[in-house]
């Protein structure tokens, strides 16, 4: 026989559109029992004997609403509320009535989304706030990825949440986990989607190419469904509370080194509250797809028109190419580490490493223009020479 709490859970799940088989599977009871109580107007009774009326009876509909619809299971709070409505009974009868509802709610009040090995990864950002690093104020963000089955966590601090950093963080998470899941669940990020059209998600073009390259299906949370990516949200809170608070660091590199060491030695070794098993143990069961041989290029992309003298402007600076590219359009690719590569029709034509000292391109342009001016020869003109007496005669009106 099912409990009264399970009876109301069956009703609620059925109203939400779940099938009889799914309800039976979630609650661990027989399908015939589910079918029976779906159409039953009353909860099951332990005894067919006529029960005495309870002082709590008039307040049970209110209590059911508060527990099942509002999620309130604090007996002290509910006791106070029904006392305000005229209840004269004690607390014990209230607690006994609430017990089956509370137990069922703990088991499955909101249906937990459990995934199969390798099926899903959840990702999200956390805006940490402004920090001072090497004398400069920067906005710090935390990226977190969690595998749905094992709860294995990867995280990294960055100074940007733009699309290029998001893709790079995803690549590093795939490498950390040793493969790619079938699906990756996102919040409704502007770096992933271009919004919705008549309820249908419009995927960002470059991000769609990225997802296809790694072979995963991108998914976004349904609006107002906070539980959908609860695993990664809990992971974010766990990292902030147990790692970030009180951690001293002088650079982002040092902060991430400490974070990754903590993930390896603490966070991913601690048994999960739901599974009872550490993420590292369950991680061995994840069936992830292999990574491609080459990383996707997450560089910033920018097209530039080359001027007649081979120069073009990028980020407020003048750059110089050979004259053969004059009037042509080139592609500038800037990696997240600052390295810059120039391309024309898919072929690399120049590479500037941020780690090396770069000669001022403005100086190169000035030098080239000077050289070009020096190659222009002055026009040679032959002039006849005459004695000055000829010009004097001309002024007096005399002709020769």
UniProtKB/Swiss-Prot annotation:
Claim: DNA-binding is one of the keywords in the record: yes
Region (Disordered): 35-55
InterPro entries xrefs: HTH_IS21_transposase_type, Integrase_cat-core, Resolvase_HTH_dom, RNaseH-like_sf, RNaseH_sf
Keywords tagged on the record: DNA recombination, DNA-binding, Transposable element, Transposition
PROSITE patterns reported in the protein's UniProt record: HTH_IS21 (PS50531), INTEGRASE (PS50994)
GO terms under biological process: DNA integration; transposition
Pfam family, one: rve
Domain of life: Bacteria
Start and end residues of each HTH IS21-type domain: 5-67
DNA-binding region per Swiss-Prot/TrEMBL record: 20-39
Residue ranges annotated for the Integrase catalytic domain, each copy included: 113-287
One GO molecular-function entry: DNA binding
Xref: NCBIfam families: transpos_IS21
Function: Involved in the transposition of the insertion sequence.
Family according to the record: Belongs to the transposase IS21/IS408/IS1162 family.
Name of this protein: Putative transposase for insertion sequence element IS5376
Source organism of the structure: Geobacillus stearothermophilus (Bacillus stearothermophilus)
């Amino acid at each position: 026989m099912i409990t009264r709490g399970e009876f109301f859970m069956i009703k609620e799940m059925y109203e939400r559109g779940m099938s009889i088989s799914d309800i039976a599977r979630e609650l661990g009871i027989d399908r015939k029992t589910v079918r029976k109580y779906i159409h039953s107007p009353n909860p099951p009774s332990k005894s067919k004997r006529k029960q005495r009326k309870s002082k709590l009876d008039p307040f049970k509909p209110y209590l059911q609403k508060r527990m099942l619809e509002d999620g309130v299971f604090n007996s002290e709070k509910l006791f106070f509320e029904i006392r305000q409505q005229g209840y004269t009974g004690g607390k014990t009868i209230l607690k006994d009535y609430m017990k089956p509802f509370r137990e069922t709610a703990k088991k499955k009040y909101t249906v937990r989304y459990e995934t199969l090995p390798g099926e899903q990864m959840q990702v999200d950002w956390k805006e940490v706030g402004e920090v001072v690093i090497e004398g400069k104020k920067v906005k710090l963000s935390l990226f977190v990825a969690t595998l749905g089955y094992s709860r294995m966590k990867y995280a990294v601090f960055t100074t940007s949440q733009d699309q290029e950093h998001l893709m790079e963080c995803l690549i590093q998470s795939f490498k950390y986990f040793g493969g790619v899941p079938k699906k990756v669940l996102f919040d409704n990020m502007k770096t992933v989607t271009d919004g919705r059209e008549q309820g249908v998600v419009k995927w960002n073009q470059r991000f769609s190419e990225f997802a296809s390259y790694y072979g995963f299906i991108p998914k976004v949370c349904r609006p107002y469904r906070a539980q959908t990516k609860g695993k990664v949200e809990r992971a974010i809170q766990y990292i902030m509370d147990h790692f970030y608070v009180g951690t001293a660091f002088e650079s982002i590199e040092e902060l991430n080194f400490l974070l990754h060491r903590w993930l390896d030695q603490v966070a991913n070794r601690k048994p999960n509250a739901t599974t009872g098993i550490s993420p590292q143990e369950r991680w061995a069961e994840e069936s992830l797809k292999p990574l491609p041989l080459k990383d996707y290029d997450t560089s910033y992309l920018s097209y530039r028109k080359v001027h007649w003298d081979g120069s073009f402007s990028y980020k407020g600076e003048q750059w110089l190419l050979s004259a053969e590219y004059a009037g042509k359009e080139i592609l500038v690719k800037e990696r997240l580490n600052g390295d810059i590569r120039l391309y024309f029709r898919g072929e690399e034509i120049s590479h500037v490493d941020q780690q090396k000292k770069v000669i001022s391109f403005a100086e190169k342009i000035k030098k080239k223009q000077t050289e070009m001016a020096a190659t222009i020869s002055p026009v040679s003109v032959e002039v006849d020479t005459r004695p000055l007496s000829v010009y004097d005669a001309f002024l007096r009106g005399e002709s020769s």
